[in-house]
C-alpha cells in the first residue's frame, strides 16, 4: 500500500493515508489513456456543422433549357453541384462524434492516471475542504497553504457545494466529484487535490 501525506486546510501535515495499490499503484497504461482521452474529446464536439445539398437549396426545379438543339451542355437544374449557387456534394451533416469504450477500458484508464499522479508526486491529500459559506478568498488561502500554484483539479465528495462554489472563480482551478471525474479532467490538471472522503469514494467506485 502506498502512503501519501494528509494535510489539513492550513497546510499542516496531520497524518498519512494508505492508498489501494490496485487503483493508485499500477503501471500506467498510456495506450489506454490515449484511447479514452480521444473518446472523451470526441464526445465534446458540437457536431452541428451542415451544408445544403442540391435537394435543400432553394430553386432549381425547372430545367434551365431544353435537352437538345441549343448547342450547350445538357442541364437538368441550376442547383446541380457544378453550378454557382448549387448544392454541395457529400458535405458535412449534423452528427454526434461520440463513441463509447468498454467499461473495463475506461476503468483501467482512470486507475492509470491516478497511479501516474501518485508516482509523479502530484497527488495532494487533504483531510477535508469545509467552508461556512462560499468564499473564493478562503479557497485561495487553502491552495496557498498547500503550495499549489499550478493547474489543479479538486476532487471532493458528493454534496460539498461550498467548495465547488468557492473555487469556480479561481483561474486554473477545476472542481469535480470523486465519482464523476473523467480521465480528460485528470490529464488536463498538473496536480490533484483530493479530500480524504473523496479517496474512499474513488476506491469504492474502482474497486
Swiss-Prot record:
Keywords: Ribonucleoprotein, Ribosomal protein, RNA-binding, rRNA-binding
Any one Pfam family match given in the protein's UniProt record, by short name: Ribosomal_L4
Signal peptide extent: none
GO MF annotations, alphabetized: rRNA binding; structural constituent of ribosome
GO biological process, one term: translation
Cellular component GO terms, alphabetical: ribonucleoprotein complex; ribosome
Entries under Gene3D superfamilies matching the protein: 3.40.1370.10
Residue segments, region Disordered: 49-78
Function: One of the primary rRNA binding proteins, this protein initially binds near the 5'-end of the 23S rRNA. It is important during the early stages of 50S assembly. It makes multiple contacts with different domains of the 23S rRNA in the assembled 50S subunit and ribosome. Forms part of the polypeptide exit tunnel.
HAMAP family recorded: Ribosomal_uL4_B
Listed NCBIfam families: rplD_bact
Subunit structure: Part of the 50S ribosomal subunit.
Similarity-based family: Belongs to the universal ribosomal protein uL4 family.
Protein name: Large ribosomal subunit protein uL4
Amino acid at each position: 500500500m502506498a502512503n501519501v501525506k494528509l494535510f489539513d486546510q492550513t497546510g499542516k501535515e496531520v497524518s498519512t493515508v494508505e492508498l489501494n495499490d490496485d487503483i493508485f499503484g499500477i503501471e500506467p497504461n498510456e495506450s489506454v489513456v490515449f484511447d479514452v482521452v480521444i473518446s472523451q474529446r470526441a464526445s465534446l464536439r458540437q457536431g452541428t456543422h451542415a451544408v445544403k445539398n442540391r435537394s435543400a437549396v432553394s430553386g432549381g426545379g425547372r430545367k434551365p433549357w431544353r435537352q437538345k438543339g441549343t448547342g450547350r451542355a445538357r442541364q437538368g437544374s441550376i442547383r446541380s453541384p457544378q453550378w454557382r449557387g448549387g448544392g454541395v456534394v457529400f458535405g458535412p451533416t449534423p452528427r454526434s462524434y461520440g463513441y463509447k469504450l468498454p467499461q473495463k477500458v475506461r476503468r483501467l484508464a482512470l486507475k492509470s492516471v491516478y497511479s501516474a499522479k501518485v508516482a509523479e508526486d502530484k497527488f495532494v491529500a487533504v483531510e477535508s475542504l469545509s467552508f461556512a459559506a462560499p468564499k473564493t478568498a478562503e479557497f485561495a488561502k487553502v491552495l496557498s497553504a498547500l503550495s499549489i500554484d499550478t493547474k489543479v483539479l479538486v476532487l471532493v465528495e458528493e454534496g460539498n457545494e461550498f467548495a465547488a462554489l468557492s473555487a469556480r472563480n479561481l483561474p486554473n482551478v477545476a472542481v469535480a466529484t470523486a465519482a464523476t471525474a473523467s480521465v480528460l479532467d485528470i490529464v488536463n490538471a498538473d496536480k490533484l487535490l483530493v479530500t480524504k472522503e473523496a479517496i474512499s469514494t474513488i476506491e469504492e467506485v474502482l474497486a
